[in-house]
Amino acid sequence: MKRISQSKAAWITRRNFSAGFGAAGIMAGTAPFNIVRGQGAALKVGVLLPKSGYQAGIGQDCQRGVDIAAGILKDLGLPPLQIMNADTETNVEVARARAEKLIGEGAQLLVGAFDSGQSSAIAQVAEQKGIPYIINIAAAPPITEQGYKFVFRNFPTAPMILRDAFVDQKEVFAASGAAPKTAVFMHVNDTFGTAMKGGIGAVMPKFDMPYKIVETIAYDPAARDLSVEISKAKATGADALLMVSRLNDAILLTRELVKQRWTPMAILSMGPGWYEDQYLKTLGKLSDGPLSFVPWYDPNKKMSKQLEAALAKASPGVNLNTNHVYTFEALLIAADAYKRAGSTDPKALAEAVRTTNIKDNVSIGPGIQFDAKGQNDKIVGGAIQNRGGKLLTVAPKEAANGKPEWPLKPYDKRT
């Protein structure tokens, strides 16, 4: 009973805050199509991801979520999806053009695109053409504030991410018996990073956090040298690094921390990069320790275990993460809606997506539903920590499979 009570209290706390803020198929490496089979006629799904450019590593990782969907969708008795892949090249205008091209080639539903700027462009095209669009990953709030009828997001907005990040940070601090008193906030200057910066100013004061931000440093996510930024952060003498980053820059920043011999008490990330498989494998023991407060999955859910098993078979040694989970769930939503709509008619599909009620899912929270704006407002974030090349969920307690290690082990003492 006590565990159930704690769980309910956690959901209520997070919901109260948000209320105030507004394979059976065969893949060919160069083939434009693959069939994710279930049963019945195939729904043509255009999947847009950044598979080249500086977000290529993440886009390619998201593709794994597409590639492992087949067996699970088949087990659920869902109809097949004909996947039409497109590379956004980490470029907003290319994303827009590729979305138009996919629709012209017969795509009946779109999925993508990881990046908020690219997803915003695709949303405009989808709404104009009247084609349902399910966002896998993108947090900029305006996307679901435009009154769109064909756009749906199964991913939290920046304020939702921050809400859960601060709730989970406090849980981690309490479990560790220690907390930073000061932090430097470093963020990418793209659409997502800018939205998160704005969100912090609005959200953080509501949580009475134990630390204050003493410096804010913005930088280009495509930068190849971040030595000046780390030097500036180190000079503040802050206890912790509060991060909103991407993959390549997370690797650069870590190498720079090592080079400049600075190990903060904690690295508290509220975005991608630090939990990526490429980050873990590239940096080895130097990747241990960062805490990521991000949209995640509940490792205790049945479907999470199915997804982990499917990924382990398709990509041995790769840890299940946000990229796979939310890309898979976008396809789960599409297949479920198609089955209920019984039609490829765009309006019927959109209405079916709108009335989604999936309780057996992967991400943390009570399931997948959309509000009047097309936003899943019931998603709950988690806290994960890199440990020995693995990712442990350390908060919230209801979804945890490990306890946090604190503080960050000095980089020069790792052998």
Task: Tell me what each language-model feature is.
Residues 2-5, 12-20, 29-415:
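Extracytosolic ligand-binding ectodomains
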Residues 25-27:
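Hydrophobic core
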